[in-house]
């Protein structure tokens, strides 16, 4: 533990908080264009083909975004909206694509948690 004199000479430094979503630049969402839509495999012990897209944002950042839900209509040059939120078993995927906004369609036949997947209320 430092003495009072040591603290006067060199005060305590505040810990720097690392930003988990730097590409958003403090914004809640950002718009971008898909440059590549592909599938990737998760880390051990999980096994699947997760749908992801490489996205060039309006601020020039190039990020990887996860496409949630079953089935999607995204392809190259699709305009999408992303939000923060990583996918724990996909290294490097720190953003989610928002379903039902811009060129991304909502999930079909979705009955529960519809707002998370951009699905309209069934009649």
From Swiss-Prot:
3-methylthioaspartic acid, modified sites: 89
Gene Ontology cellular component terms for the protein in this record: small ribosomal subunit
One GO term of the biological process aspect: translation
GO MF annotation, one: structural constituent of ribosome
Keywords from the UniProt entry: Methylation, Ribonucleoprotein, Ribosomal protein, RNA-binding, rRNA-binding, tRNA-binding
Family matches, as CDD domains: Ribosomal_S12
InterPro entries assigned to the protein according to its UniProt record, in alphabetical order: NA-bd_OB-fold (IPR012340), Ribosomal_uS12 (IPR006032), Ribosomal_uS12_bac (IPR005679)
Source organism, top-level taxon: Bacteria
A Pfam family matched in the record: Ribosom_S12_S23
Function description: With S4 and S5 plays an important role in translational accuracy. Interacts with and stabilizes bases of the 16S rRNA that are involved in tRNA selection in the A site and with the mRNA backbone. Located at the interface of the 30S and 50S subunits, it traverses the body of the 30S subunit contacting proteins on the other side and probably holding the rRNA structure together. The combined cluster of proteins S8, S12 and S17 appears to hold together the shoulder and platform of the 30S subunit.
Subunit structure: Part of the 30S ribosomal subunit. Contacts proteins S8 and S17. May interact with IF1 in the 30S initiation complex.
PANTHER family: 30S RIBOSOMAL PROTEIN S12 FAMILY MEMBER
Family: Belongs to the universal ribosomal protein uS12 family.
Name the record gives this protein: Small ribosomal subunit protein uS12
Organism lineage: Bacteria, Pseudomonadati, Pseudomonadota, Alphaproteobacteria, Hyphomicrobiales
């Amino acid at each position: 533990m430092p003495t009072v004199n040591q603290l006067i000479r060199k005060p305590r430094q505040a810990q720097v908080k690392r930003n988990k979503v730097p590409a958003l630049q403090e914004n809640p969402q950002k718009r971008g264009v898909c440059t590549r839509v592909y599938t990737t495999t998760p880390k051990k012990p999980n096994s699947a083909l997760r749908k992801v897209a490489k996205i060039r944002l309006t601020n020039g950042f190039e990020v990887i975004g996860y496409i949630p839900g079953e089935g999607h209509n995204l392809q190259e040059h699709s305009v999408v909206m992303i939000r923060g939120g990583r996918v724990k078993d996909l290294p490097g995927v720190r953003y989610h694509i928002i379903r039902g906004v811009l060129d991304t369609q909502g999930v079909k036949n979705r009955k529960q948690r519809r707002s998370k997947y951009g699905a309209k209320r069934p009649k």
